Amino acid sequence: MNNLQTFIGLLEAEGELVRIAAPVSSDLEIAEIHRRVISAGGPALLFENIKGSDFPAATNLFGTSRRVDLAFGKRPDQFLKELVKIAEELPTLSPRKLWSHRRLAREGLKVGLRTVRDGPVLACRQPSPNLERLPLIKTWPEDGGHFVTLPLVYTEHPITGQHNLGMYRIQRHDTCTLGVHWQIQKGGGFHYHVAEKQDNALPLALFVGGPPSLILSAIAPLPEGVPELILTSLLQGSKVKRVRDPNGSLPLLAEAEFAIVGHVPPHTRKPEGPFGDHYGYYSLRHDYPVLEVNNVYHRRGAIFPATVVGKPPQEDFFLGNYIQELMAPLSRLVMPSIKAIWSYGETGYHCLSSIVIEERYPREAMKFAFRILGEDGGQLSLTKFLVVHDGEGLNLKDFRQVLEHVLARIQFETDLFVIANLAMDTLDYTGPAVNEGSKGILVGVGPPKRNLPVDFAGPLPKGASDVQTYCAGCLALSGPDYNRDPSYGQTLACDPAISKWPLIFLVDDASIVANNVRFL
């Protein structure tokens, strides 16, 4: 799948796309239509008549597991699994066995970058860019403006020349400038930091659209320094075509729908945000670098892809789960002592992850926990709460199973760790300041220490209005507001009605346990 328009054609042929010819506004209306359709499990949407825009826009392209499968197929998964298998067996592989994997070598020859003389993205150029004519969307009422929500931000390290392709939200400030939300632990932000120390502007190419694999590569949790375009090539099964920018220094992706090219000057910031984010609340307004746009290129008949984020599950939920499953074999190769990893899209991914380990000596579990939280590059180091357990036969995607396994084994005095004064995801506002906060580690390994109660029976604890079971051993309890009774938690902990339950959540509405997204 080498470009967006081929993918859109496939979706239409498969009955997975609806064209909307009626005039619509990019100011909240497209986003609301998108939200209603995705919540109903509906099709991808192609908005052909957007008020004030010269281009159509497509949303919900990846809003179901089936459409994700149509975008990428089985090849990437099969290729990576075979590659990892060879890497694991390499020391003992006989020449005959190695020869049996020759198909993989042929596939490997297709991986890489290829420079071409011309490309569709150069078909049209706007010498005097007017970003107001592009269908950037405003998705939530309190958003600070209109955003590129599927941006592919390409930069090169000012010293090494190594490239980075990342997805960092982009806000339109005016007709020729954009805000670049380089949050913590982002490769493009590291490039800008180096350029700024040299008092130099950083060249930047913002691509919109292109092969679907570009989007997946931009969000993949790759270690710093691993080139995203190589993953793109691997996913699509052919070399990524690049073309020289006749008016700039960076290469352009030949099959992109749009290339918005400019530079980010040093020591320049403008307010960016607020933005309704994937955690389900607004990230606030902060100062961020500014992209000064020099040129806008686009292919003929260009389509502007977009998405809408918010409380999960949204479109990024399906992409996030796919990339986790795809990268699982590589994770086991890089971290062989960790048998499995899963981050929970219901929480926005960074908030909650669990890993499966085998503890060979007391407290070894903490070594594995620090291995995850200390991951060099990638996004695992931003994990807020990590559950470490030895439930190898569990379905990691079912957090109830994981939590029951842990609660049967945990001693909270020795197995719950809260580490303060750490760097946090920029979008996490639970700490004392931006990028600051605490992390938690919960360990449940070894033989069971207790039998977990399954159903709550008996009178409600004093002051409680409702009790619901989330899983064996875990209750949600509706209690008084903290401002009304700040000591209620201490009172509840001494109530014999809950003495057999190892974990109780004191909440406003205990019925949230029925919905994993609301509860987690």
Predicted regions and their residues:
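Extended, highly charged
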Residues: 1-275, 280-290, 294-505, 511, ...
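Charged phosphotransfer/docking patches of two-component systems
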Residues: 513-515
